[in-house]
Amino acid sequence: MAQRRYWFICVACCFLHFAVSLAAQTLQIVTADGVSRTLTAAQIAGSPHVTVSVKDHDVAAQFEGVPLATLLAGAGVQLGDKLRGPRLTEVLMVDAADHYQVVFALAEIDPAFATREIILADKRDGKPLDAKEGPFRIVAPGDKRPARWVRQVTGLRVSAVK
């Protein structure tokens, strides 16, 4: 009986590990209207990428990833001429696996307002992000401190500040 219980626990742990690994390889985007879209690592890897050259803790690095504006537009978030008036109160909450969260105003992300591209990186110096950083990381060139460079990103949520 104890041996069966042991095997059951082993199998359950394997399935749990597999489920956590799969969840870690996806990104959930939720719009201000509550519409949710989940992207896989493969879908993100297949999206148009840009490269940004930055210093990460005083070390030169090149990150490759998808501009947040591209990801949000693909999920149905209206940017550009549609981002005006009351919609300028909308923000993007970035969620990490360790429950760390940061906020960006949508205007910071929108190329119609901002001169920099904030990206969801999946590569650093030509290699996939390691488990400590990835699979996804926010890179915000121009921030004086990297406090909003979220590692292990799991979700992007748009909401209006009231």
Regions found by a protein language model. Give the residues of each.
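N-terminal secretory signal peptides that target proteins for export/translocation
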Residues: 1-6
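Bacterial N-terminal signal peptides
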Residues: 9-21
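N-terminal intrinsically disordered, low-complexity segments enriched in P/E/S/T
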Residues: 22-162
